[in-house]
Every structure is written in C-alpha cells, then in structure tokens.
UniProtKB/Swiss-Prot annotation:
Belongs to the universal ribosomal protein uL30 family. The lineage of its organism: Eukaryota, Metazoa, Chordata, Craniata, Vertebrata. This is Large ribosomal subunit protein uL30. Keywords: Ribonucleoprotein, Ribosomal protein. NCBIfam families: uL30_euk. InterPro entries: Ribo_uL30_ferredoxin-like_sf, Ribosomal_uL30, Ribosomal_uL30_euk, Ribosomal_uL30_euk_arc, Ribosomal_uL30_ferredoxin-like, Ribosomal_uL30_N_euk. One of its GO terms (molecular function) is structural constituent of ribosome. It comes from the Eukaryota. One of its GO terms (biological process) is maturation of LSU-rRNA from tricistronic rRNA transcript (SSU-rRNA, 5.8S rRNA, LSU-rRNA). It comes from Sus scrofa. GO terms for cellular component: cytosolic large ribosomal subunit; nucleolus.
Length: 247
C-alpha cells in the first residue's frame, strides 16, 4: 500500500517534455561530433608531451598519502552513522585521480566514476559506506531527494543498449530490459531508484553514470569553480544543492 501511494505522488512525464528532451539529446550529439572533429584537427602536428619531474613527485606523494589513510581505516574503521530514513545515496567524483593508489583507482572503476563530475546512485548499506570511505578524498556524496532523482533521470538518464548509448525517452526500451522487474516506463524507473528495493542493483546498473555539466568559467577559473563545488566527502542532504548546480 505504501509503495502504491508513493507511485501516485509521482506526476507523469508530459509528452512535450520527452519531445524536448529528444531534441536536446540530438543537439548535444551533434555538438559532441563537432567537438571531436575539432579535437582531431588540433592533435595533428602536436609535439609529444613529457611528464615533468614535479609530477612524478606529486604522484608519489598522493600514493603515500592514500596508503597511510587506508591503513588507518583498517586499524580504526570508524564508520559514519547514517540516519535510518535514508536508503539512497548519490556519489559524484569531483577530483582527478591520476597518480593515486591502485586500490583507489580500482574502487573508482568499480563505482563506474571514470570521468570527473560523473555521478551514480547507490543503495546505502554498511558495505557502501566502507567503499565510499576508500575514495572519500576524491568524491562527494549525500542523500538526494525525489526531485533531484527525477530531474537527473529526465535530463541526463541514459542506457547502453547493443553497444549504443541511448537517452531514456522510449518506454519500450525500458520495458524490454527491465520489464522482468516490473519496470515498464520512466515513472517506474524513477520510483525504483528513489525508493531502493531488492532489484535496485540491476535497475541502477541499467543506467549509465550521469555526466554532469561544468560551468563555462571553470576552465578559466578552476580554483574559483572548485570553491563553488565544495570539498569532497560526505555532505548529507546538501548534495541536492550540488545536483541543482551541475545538472
């Protein structure tokens, strides 16, 4: 009964919104192709770049810092107390991981956060918290509300079908791949993510990591932009502010 009431509270997606989203995705695809062609042209005639000694020293320092931090976690695994009312987390990678510990790199890959400012939904469990502690200096995470979940999936929701990345604008695709879990439309998908159940892993795995947008001024003023984004680590319900900022 509780699940049925929660489903009723979620409004349906207007058809005109789906059409707008299709047009938006087509525009972004065209822009991506143009950017790729420009990048290929720029690469022609470029000289090889050599890594400076300072970068090797920097990487060595990052690896040492990670080893010390991970050793402390093993000795004193003080966990974060998570309120019972929260069962869903959204994790965003906000730091570069070049030169970090191999343990951190493998954990980042397992979380599917291969690109900076990419994000994924995770079900909150003791094991999840332990995993997040490993990558804590490189990600930020918290508890998204229904509005944030809905906006992320509607605007940036994608899936990989037959080696092709497609936007989630067709309920037929959702029903074909998730129908066995009782998910037959976009509204069902939003509900299953917002209120994690026994099929959460399979359903969230169907979604591609969300690639969030970065403000244009970030390339010119990286320090200022990172101040706006905030520090890595746990931020509770304040993750919703970051989602609004980057979505």
């Amino acid at each position: 009964m509780a699940e049925e009431e929660q489903r009723k509270k979620i409004p349906l997606v207007p058809e005109n919104l789906l059409k707008k989203r299709k047009a938006y995705q087509a525009l972004k695809a065209t822009q991506a192709k143009q950017a790729l062609l420009q990048k290929k042209e720029q690469r022609k005639g470029k000289e090889l770049k050599f890594k400076r000694l300072e970068w090797f020293l920097h990487d060595s320092w990052r690896q040492l810092r990670d080893r010390v931090r991970l050793r402390r976690l093993e000795v004193k695994p003080h966990g974060l107390e998570v309120p019972d009312k929260h069962s869903l987390a959204f994790v965003v990678r906000i730091e570069r991981i070049s030169g970090v510990s191999s343990v951190v790199q493998r954990t980042i890959a397992r979380l599917r956060l291969k690109k900076i400012f990419s994000g994924v939904f995770m079900q909150v469990t003791p094991q999840t918290i332990k995993t997040l502690r490993i990558v804590e200096p490189y990600v930020t995470w918290g508890f998204p509300n229904l509005k944030s979940v809905r906006e992320l999936i509607l605007k940036r929701g994608q899936a990989k079908v037959k080696n092709k990345i497609i936007p989630l604008t067709d309920n037929t695709v959702i029903e074909e791949h998730l129908g066995k879990f009782g998910v037959i439309c976009l509204e069902d998908l939003i509900h299953e993510i917002a209120f994690p159940g026994k099929n959460f892993q399979a359903i969230s795995g169907f979604l591609r990591p969300f690639q969030l947008s970065v403000a244009r001024h970030a390339t010119k003023n990286r320090v200022g932009f990172l101040k706006e984004v905030g520090s890595p680590g746990y931020r509770g319900e304040r993750i919703n502010q970051l989602i609004r900022q980057l979505n």
